[in-house]
Amino acid sequence: NERHLDDIEQGMIRTPGAFDEPRIHIALVCASIGCPMLRNDAYTAERLEAQLEDGMRRFFSDRTRNRYDASSGTLRVSKLFDWYAKDFESGHAGFASLAATFAKYADRLADTPEAQARIRSGDYRLEFLDYDWMLNDAR
């Protein structure tokens, strides 16, 4: 019985009731420039919670993929949050909405306390960045 990676992600992992974990989008990456960076270590059951949380914090800290422009009040985030919005609005793993997700990681999305406060209060215009499908070279 053959399976491809999309079957595993969409048909097994994202199936409602299977794992109900929105942070999976930080772990399952296609190695394109638009994806979160690959980890240097393997995911393990013992460390999975910490690894997923670390992945979210690292992804939101990456200004090429997510950023807040204080001058325009615009939060520009990865297209992943557009494509998988419902996963972050499901209430699973403490994620009830995109706004709540961004508020949780405001300290990673913005550099100043004022900008972080605006994100936490939802006082921003949201834009999704274009997704870069080019292969992410090894660094």
Where do the protein language model's features map onto the residues?
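C-terminal region detector
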Residues: 1-139
